[in-house]
Amino acid sequence: MSEKKLAVNEYLKTDSDYLRGTIQEGLDTAVTGAFSEGDQQLIKFHGFYQQDDRDLRNERKEQKLEPLYSFMLRARVAGGVCSPQQWLAVDDIASNLTSSNSIRLTTRQTFQYHGIPKRNLKTIIQDLDREALDSIAACGDVNRNVMCNPNPVESKLHQQAYAYAKQLSDNMLPHTKAYAEIWLDDEKLVTTEGEEVEPVYGKTYLPRKFKMAVAVPPDNDVDVYTNDLGFVAVAEEGELVGFNMVAGGGMGSTHGEVATFPRLADDFGYIKAEDTLKFAEAVMTVQRDWGNRENRKLSRLKYTIVKHGYDAFKAEVEKRTGIKFEPKRDVVIGDRGDRYGWKQGVDDNWHLTLFIEGGRVKDLPGQPLQTGLREIAKIHQGDFRMTSNQNIIIAGVPAADKDKIEALARQHGLMGKLITETRGHSIACVALPTCALAMAEAERYFPDFLTKVEALQDKHGFLDQGIVIRMTGCPNGCARPFAAEIGLVGKAPGRYNLYLGASFEGTRLNKLYRENIQEAEILAELDSLFARYVAERETGETFGNYTVRSGVVTAVIDAAKDFHG
């Protein structure tokens, strides 16, 4: 029997000397703004992607110039928590070392930079390192940034859950010294074949990206069921005692390929808090050993569980931990939105959640958002918490400092603008012009599109009710569109697939309703559906639930069988 042919990335990882490749040589080459094709895959493990300005592609081609290459660098910030001092450093880098001059808050509670020339990469990574920040494993076939509910009201429980998110992030880091050697000028370590450099990942790391989240009920802003691995906090008398573990979620799919599909995670049962790291490592190593390394489109954990079966996967995790799952505990999974404005925590400190449109922290006409956050960071004594809805929380504000913080926020346009429930619950990915995978606009177009949807809600008399709407430029699902009540996924310039029927809480996927349609058709469909919804809805019924109950779309129960069916 012939040996299975692995995906190209598997050979690249094997031959990379634990993620070193020829990155250093590429960094030293000034003749091009790009890295080699192989190194473009390896640099993801170091936290960045090679991109180019797609708005300028044709113009530069006519001028016989190479594309305007730049890099997107994403930081690793477990749970989205950083200090004001760190924020000031992050802001300084954005202002001085990137062409975008902005900070992009992501849907996974971290920040990323766009428009970094190759010559600035090392400086940025070293500047971040001085503030105890890094981009290790923010991308690539490893455990990515670990999410955790900011939950500013339940401060004590949040801190306990956050501590586990931080441990998960730190313990699942790659052990290779390639990052330190290349970017921080650490001395090169000589490795031999016999050394166990990566005790968890092994020489070829994971088959594909791996995403974790820690949820603190009733909040589900981290969309815990969309992750490869999720831990839902269980508390007794306000103290964290354990987690319900879920596994096998993921949003990515490919247009036209029915073997690919988004999926929500399965519930596996309750585990004690002290066993969290054991179970995380067990799930990751089962995926390492069982995952598909031949076809990267089918490499995520969700496909591994579908292929081998829930029971077999569960048994293998229990075997590797030596611990049986207990029956899952009852918890309430609720809102996925953020609590905007001031909220007081159990520690009597105050927390201010600020809405950041599209997660883009930038000075705009009449809204100098970036300057405002910079000025707040100069006087704030607590911390900054980035949310998975691309917003930011000024957390831990003593009552005596509230007025000063609010004055700065209002002065710089960070407060005072009315945010509808729908806009406050909705997110979009970056897409054009920098993302190489984007087929249509998202971040640049989404605010105007939402304004038109809000007008329809107002027309039908339910603008006070939130609908979770999400838009992505492609089906890879960075903004989790398949878990939105209204999901719009780019198909071509100006054209989107329209998905309906996810639950408001994120416990059911949506389903394709109309394919490859333009804005006018999308709005016409929503206008008609909103009219029906207002006339036919039951008391308290959300829009997503209505579209399923009324038969507009059928419920997705088992994504492998019925997402495309």
Swiss-Prot record:
Siroheme binds at C478. GO terms for biological process: cysteine biosynthetic process; hydrogen sulfide biosynthetic process; sulfate assimilation. Its cofactor is siroheme; [4Fe-4S] cluster. The keyword Iron-sulfur applies. Component of the sulfite reductase complex that catalyzes the 6-electron reduction of sulfite to sulfide. This is one of several activities required for the biosynthesis of L-cysteine from sulfate. Pfam families: NIR_SIR, NIR_SIR_ferr. It catalyses: hydrogen sulfide + 3 NADP(+) + 3 H2O = sulfite + 3 NADPH + 4 H(+). Belongs to the nitrite and sulfite reductase 4Fe-4S domain family. It comes from the Bacteria. Alpha(8)-beta(8). The alpha component is a flavoprotein, the beta component is a hemoprotein. [4Fe-4S] cluster binds at C429, C435, C474, C478. The gene is cysI. Binds 1 siroheme per subunit. Binds 1 [4Fe-4S] cluster per subunit. Pathway: Sulfur metabolism; hydrogen sulfide biosynthesis; hydrogen sulfide from sulfite (NADPH route): step 1/1. InterPro entries: CysI, NiRdtase/SiRdtase_haem-b_fer, Nit/Sulf_reduc_fer-like_dom_sf, NO2/SO3_Rdtase_4Fe4S_dom, NO2/SO3_Rdtase_4Fe4S_prot, NO2/SO3_Rdtase_4Fe4S_sf, NO2/SO3_Rdtase_FeS/sirohaem_BS. Keywords: 4Fe-4S, Amino-acid biosynthesis, Cysteine biosynthesis, Heme, Iron, Iron-sulfur, Metal-binding, NADP, Oxidoreductase. This is Sulfite reductase [NADPH] hemoprotein beta-component. Its EC number is 1.8.1.2. The keyword Iron-sulfur applies. PANTHER family: SULFITE REDUCTASE [NADPH] SUBUNIT BETA (PTHR11493:SF47), SULFITE REDUCTASE [NADPH] SUBUNIT BETA-RELATED (PTHR11493). GO terms for cellular component: sulfite reductase complex (NADPH).
